[in-house]
Design a protein with these regions (language model features):
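Glycine-rich, proline-tolerant flexible connector loops at the mouths of alpha/beta enzymes
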Residues: 69-88, 144-147
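N-terminal secretory signal peptides and thylakoid transit peptides that target proteins
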Residues: 1-15
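Conserved, mostly hydrophobic/aromatic
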Residues: 58, 66, 91, 129, ...
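Hydrophobic faces of well-ordered beta-strands that scaffold small-molecule active sites
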Residues: 42-48, 66-68, 98-103, 137-139, ...
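Active-site beta-loop-alpha junctions enriched in small/polar residues
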Residues: 49-51, 71, 103-106, 142-144, ...
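Acidic/histidine-rich catalytic cores of soluble enzymes
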Residues: 66, 101, 162-267, 271
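C-terminal helical cap(s) of enzyme catalytic domains, especially alpha/beta-barrels
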Residues: 304-329
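Active-site acidic/histidine proton-transfer and metal-coordination neighborhood
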Residues: 11-20, 32-36, 48, 52-59, ...
Length: 330
């Protein structure tokens, strides 16, 4: 009998995830850069603020890592050497590693002073990530109001090639933008990624791939993941629900017709999506990004401890995703 992992190495994603008869040898495609850890499988993580309590919760819920957002404490310009040592001690004590950090900055800020400061700050984020043992830093692509897509592509490629990627090479890091559509993140769709990657061939630059943002734009996340499989360096695990009765009344430019959900409670076909990752040899972080109001509390998520309702969402997400991720299975 062919075992599951042997099958994943031999069978093409088109047979498993795309419903087609064609078989593709995964060895033909380049594997993306890894995130820390010797085991060659995706690491299930949560995206969260830093606190010892949150790392302890992640461990208790069966997660292997955390992806940490910058905040007033967790900041490369504020953390002392002693505080960094304490963070690393917490990582050792909990057994939950910091897989990556999130530095959502505007690398194309219109003001030259702000732009210079932002780029210097991002390099300090890279240095902090390296000290914490990370192999990836997530960010935005940036945005400049009034500039064309091609102009923004050219400027982003310049800062990547000339400033960021030499540092990444030195520190053994990958970087990439999350595909969240907003004013300071112009590169959020496949056509734009192709333009940027044509000018930035280094595979230390890739994507922090979030399929939920594609669903609400009616872009197929499975096909897109396969098309960019060798440039996916990190994953946000978040689902999207389309509320058809509302959409039928307000249209795509209206509000309230979609909402983010925890994995398994929206439209994404997670077995197919994760099959793409496994076929591609992805062994970075799959971080649950919890923006599901159904499994949360109105007052937000500011304290060192999560509310139990929010924890419940992460626990359910872990139970669901673990079905499809090899993880610590023997």
């Amino acid at each position: 009998m062919v075992k599951r992992r042997e099958f994943l190495k031999a069978a093409g994603v088109s047979a498993v995830a795309m419903g087609r008869p064609h078989v593709l040898n995964v060895a033909q495609s380049s594997a993306p850069a890894s995130v820390p850890g010797d085991a060659k499988y995706p690491k299930l993580a949560i995206k969260t603020r830093y606190s010892p309590q949150r790392l302890a919760f992640a461990a208790s819920a069966g997660y292997e890592g955390v992806v940490v957002d910058l905040d007033d404490f967790f900041d490369p310009d504020k953390l002392s050497d002693n505080q960094i040592d304490q963070i690393l001690a917490t990582v050792r004590d909990t057994g939950v590693r910091i897989i990556s950090i999130e530095c959502m900055l505007n690398h194309l800020a219109p003001d030259s002073v702000e732009r210079r400061q932002t780029r210097a700050r991002f390099i300090r984020c890279l240095e902090l990530a390296h000290r914490l043992g990370c192999k990836f830093v997530g960010t935005f692509s940036g945005g400049k109001k009034g500039a064309s897509v091609d102009e923004q592509v050219k400027e982003l490629a310049e800062v990547l090639n000339e400033q960021y990627l030499p540092v990444c090479e030195k520190l053994d890091l990958g970087i990439g933008p999350e595909n969240y559509p907003c004013d300071v993140n112009f590169a959020t769709v496949p056509a734009t990624w192709e333009k940027v990657m044509a000018l930035v061939p280094s595979h230390r630059f890739g994507l922090e791939f979030d399929p939920s943002h594609l669903v609400r734009q009616y872009i197929d996340p499975i096909q897109t993941a396969w098309d960019f499989r060798d440039r996916i360096l990190a994953v946000h695990a978040k689902d999207t629900e389309i509320i058809q009765p509302v959409l039928a009344k307000v249209g795509i430019h209206g509000k309230g017709w979609w909402r983010y959900r925890i994995p398994g409670q929206g439209l994404i076909d997670w077995p197919k999506f994760i099959t793409v990752l496994l076929q591609a040899g992805f062994h970075g972080g799959v971080a649950v990004e919890h923006e599901d109001e159904f499994w949360d509390v109105p007052q937000g998520d500011d304290g060192p401890e999560m509310a139990q309702e929010r924890k419940d969402g992460f626990i359910l997400a872990a139970r669901f995703l673990r079905q499809y991720l090899p993880g610590r299975l023997s």
